[in-house]
Amino acid sequence: MTKKSIVNLSPADVAGKRVLVRVDFNVPLDGATITDDTRIRAALPTIKDLIEKGAKVILCSHFGRPKGQVVESMRLTPVATRLSELLGQPVVMCDDCIGDSVTAAINQLQNGQVALLENLRFHAEEEANDPEFAQKLAANADLYVNDAFGTAHRAHASTEGVTHYLSPNVAGYLIEKELNYLQAAIENPQRPLVAIIGGSKVSSKIGVIETLLEKCDKLIIGGGMIFTFYKARGLNVGKSLVEDDKLELAKSLEAKAKEKGVDFLLPTDVVLADNFAPDANAKTVSIDAIEDGWMGLDIGPESVKVFQAALADCKSVIWNGPMGVFEFDKFAKGTEAIAHTLAELTGKGTITIIGGGDSVAAVEKVGVADKMSHISTGGGASLELLEGKVLPGIAALDEV
């Protein structure tokens, strides 16, 4: 499934045209100050490309969860200010995303100018994918570009609805890169392919583990979910997090890995804590020596060595989810070691894909984000794509 992208649009296709671009400007704010503008910068290649080709660029995004009401603190004005600084040109801030005032503002745009529509989620119809709202949103544009991978797994008016009223409908550079890396890793990986799955719960990663067991050569499991696997093996896990209703599933996943010939690696030692706190007392033990009253919050140093050895010959790696409670420095060593290992492997030619969510925060915290082949910008969207699901926002785009 190859989707049309902005690369397929010539200057003649877009010059003088009104191009509606769905971006993800859901950035963290402290008052009116943007504390991290990564998502704004990530959209710049698509925006600049359209400016250079002489389009009238109309950007739309959600911000926070205003639940269909106008919430003053969730207006996109600070985003327009920052975007204007990054582009080095003015950005017209609209007072709504549909209606006469928006139409008037867009009609004033010259070729190569940019307007930002107000928060889409001030209208409940956005998340409901209301056709009438989608039609109003599309009425001010000629064609559509989706560059918001983080919301591609949702069928909203701005991600799916508008495509029924505009043509062509294409992917921006960000979505194109996501599809190139994530789909290639699943459908046609360079082998050996190793998947590293972490996080606290097996339940949230069942789909991705099951899909990757069909695709990968080795599967490394870390994070809180390891204790469900240990308990399923009959080991004592103390006060560690366990999903008792997933013990049979854990057994079946291990059995499936064996049946498929996939190396299934669980930690051999863990770092225990006497309570869930950054200053808890800690000790490292073998997995068969976990005592009552203690909980595992990280993988141990022996496990790190075993995992590093398993990763040494890999050509592709997908990492989703931390190895421990990396927010606490005392229990971040496992996650940090894996991040550094992947950074080194990238330097040797391995394709390293950080599949969204907490693993992205982890590689950023360690300072090796720029050393990975690809960092996915979507949390839920990355997981669903890795699970092999169809994402509505991608399915709605034109085929090549």
From Swiss-Prot:
<dbReference type="GO" id="GO:0004618">
    <property type="term" value="F:phosphoglycerate kinase activity"/>
</dbReference>
<dbReference type="GO" id="GO:0006094">
    <property type="term" value="P:gluconeogenesis"/>
</dbReference>
<feature type="binding site">
    <location>
        <position position="296"/>
    </location>
    <ligand>
        <name>ATP</name>
    </ligand>
</feature>
<feature type="binding site">
    <location>
        <begin position="62"/>
        <end position="65"/>
    </location>
    <ligand>
        <name>substrate</name>
    </ligand>
</feature>
<dbReference type="InterPro" id="IPR036043">
    <property type="entry name" value="Phosphoglycerate_kinase_sf"/>
</dbReference>
<feature type="binding site">
    <location>
        <position position="154"/>
    </location>
    <ligand>
        <name>substrate</name>
    </ligand>
</feature>
<dbReference type="InterPro" id="IPR015911">
    <property type="entry name" value="Phosphoglycerate_kinase_CS"/>
</dbReference>
<keyword id="KW-0963">Cytoplasm</keyword>
<dbReference type="GO" id="GO:0005524">
    <property type="term" value="F:ATP binding"/>
</dbReference>
<keyword id="KW-0808">Transferase</keyword>
<keyword id="KW-0324">Glycolysis</keyword>
<feature type="binding site">
    <location>
        <position position="205"/>
    </location>
    <ligand>
        <name>ATP</name>
    </ligand>
</feature>
<keyword id="KW-0067">ATP-binding</keyword>
<dbReference type="Pfam" id="PF00162">
    <property type="entry name" value="PGK"/>
</dbReference>
<feature type="binding site">
    <location>
        <begin position="356"/>
        <end position="359"/>
    </location>
    <ligand>
        <name>ATP</name>
    </ligand>
</feature>
<dbReference type="InterPro" id="IPR001576">
    <property type="entry name" value="Phosphoglycerate_kinase"/>
</dbReference>
<feature type="binding site">
    <location>
        <begin position="24"/>
        <end position="26"/>
    </location>
    <ligand>
        <name>substrate</name>
    </ligand>
</feature>
<feature type="binding site">
    <location>
        <position position="39"/>
    </location>
    <ligand>
        <name>substrate</name>
    </ligand>
</feature>
<comment type="pathway">
    <text>Carbohydrate degradation; glycolysis; pyruvate from D-glyceraldehyde 3-phosphate: step 2/5.</text>
</comment>
<keyword id="KW-0547">Nucleotide-binding</keyword>
<comment type="similarity">
    <text>Belongs to the phosphoglycerate kinase family.</text>
</comment>
<feature type="binding site">
    <location>
        <position position="121"/>
    </location>
    <ligand>
        <name>substrate</name>
    </ligand>
</feature>
<keyword id="KW-0418">Kinase</keyword>
<dbReference type="GO" id="GO:0005829">
    <property type="term" value="C:cytosol"/>
</dbReference>
<dbReference type="GO" id="GO:0043531">
    <property type="term" value="F:ADP binding"/>
</dbReference>
<dbReference type="InterPro" id="IPR015824">
    <property type="entry name" value="Phosphoglycerate_kinase_N"/>
</dbReference>
<protein>
    <recommendedName>
        <fullName>Phosphoglycerate kinase</fullName>
        <ecNumber>2.7.2.3</ecNumber>
    </recommendedName>
</protein>
<comment type="subunit">
    <text>Monomer.</text>
</comment>
<feature type="binding site">
    <location>
        <position position="327"/>
    </location>
    <ligand>
        <name>ATP</name>
    </ligand>
</feature>
<dbReference type="GO" id="GO:0006096">
    <property type="term" value="P:glycolytic process"/>
</dbReference>
